[in-house]
């Protein structure tokens, strides 16, 4: 089984991903796109998506982009930085596109853009992952 097929299968088994109804729309070397609906159960009282939910969707895209760079294993996030630019409203789809921007011997750095249905940038993230021990 190739790594990309293995990762696609793995994504479908993610318990939190299933809870978020997340979909892996694109997976290729160094890039992943994950989409999830911003349902009412993921909102704060003001009717916008809770920041941790947006971060989780960004993290899923980032880790799957990062995992395309290693032959096996998972990669723990060691640092996450997120800037929230615009709210994501109930019923919108959160779409996170992650790209690997640095790939060294011990870590992978990703850059993530999260957009809503209107195509506008809602959040940006930089997420650093540790590579598995060899």
Write out the residue ranges for each language-model feature.
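Short, charged/polar surface micro-motifs in flexible loops or helix N-caps
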Residues: 39-42, 60-61, 90
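A short interface-forming secondary-structure element
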Residues: 38-50, 54
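Non-catalytic linker/capping segments at the edges of enzyme domains
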Residues: 1-35, 39-41
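A short coil-to-beta-strand element that immediately follows conserved catalytic motifs
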Residues: 74-77
